[in-house]
């Protein structure tokens, strides 16, 4: 497979998407069978996924690249990969938005973190009920107490107190105890 990709590049055309996917799977299989070391396999997969996100920018490749970075303990690269997927509007799950927001907070980017959460709250997806077939349009990031607290914290850290207060008030109304009112 590596030879086919190399020959395609030498001849001046872009190798097929499936070739890269197959090559990444081969490295994963060789790693699992302990034929090659995990570090080498992960390095090879990173190179392949970096090509895939550039030539064929699909969500699955961004997530696979990010996951590989995580396995290599390259958290900054993982965050940047998630951010790139976000910038391309490829994220469509609450956990993806919240993971990116939390990583941005860890890297002291609270304003961006808040923007990511708000974007997730504003993004609408259609959910289909398997039993009834009814469709419902919902926000990707739900307005739950925990999420609202995270958003309020991000706004506060970004010195956007006027944006944090209404969010905290909403979270406090959802709270089962009075702790949120103290914040």
Explain the meaning of each model-derived region:
Residues 1-183:
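Alpha-solenoid helical repeat scaffolds
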């Amino acid at each position: 497979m590596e030879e086919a990709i190399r020959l395609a590049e030498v001849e001046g055309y872009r190798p097929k998407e499936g070739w890269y996917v197959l090559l990444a799977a081969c490295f994963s299989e060789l790693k699992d069978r302990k034929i090659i070391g995990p570090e080498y396999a992960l390095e090879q997969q990173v190179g392949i996924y970096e090509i895939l996100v550039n030539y064929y920018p699909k969500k699955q490749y961004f997530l696979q690249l990010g996951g590989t970075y995580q396995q290599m303990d390259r958290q900054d690269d993982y965050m940047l990969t998630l951010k790139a997927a976000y910038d391309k509007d490829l994220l469509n799950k609450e956990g993806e938005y919240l993971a990116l927001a939390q990583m941005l907070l860890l890297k002291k980017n609270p304003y961006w973190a808040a923007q990511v959460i708000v974007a997730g709250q504003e993004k609408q997806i259609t959910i289909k009920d398997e039993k009834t077939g009814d469709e419902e349009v919902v926000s990707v990031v739900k307005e739950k107490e925990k999420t609202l607290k995270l958003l309020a914290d991000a706004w506060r850290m970004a010195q956007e107190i006027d944006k944090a207060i209404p969010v905290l008030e909403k979270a406090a109304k959802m709270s089962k105890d009075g702790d949120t009112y103290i914040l």
